[in-house]
């Protein structure tokens, strides 16, 4: 597809996020995409629900999916958009919280944060 005048490819790995680095590496190699032109968009339990954080590069923090991406790309040098879904409720299993259906009381807030994320993605791609 396109965003503005830029051609884009949206890759949604069929694996769990924690193993997504391999498919991102394979797609980057197949399409000959330099690492700094890959934009990874992901949810993050360490960021307050509804918040968006944008980074040009950096460490994976506690996010195992980003650890996989960095390991398979061999670099931290790619931009990312983090969509806050945290914190998990107390005494709640982290994996089941992250993989669960969004509760009704959070759907509107999730929609708003996704709109912010989409606006940010458009700006990042347009200014790349």
Placement of each model-derived feature along the sequence:
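Nucleotide and nucleotide-moiety/phosphate-recognizing core
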Residues: 1-57, 67, 71, 75-81, ...
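Short glycine-enriched, charge-decorated loop/helix-capping segments at active-site entrances
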Residues: 53-59, 97-102
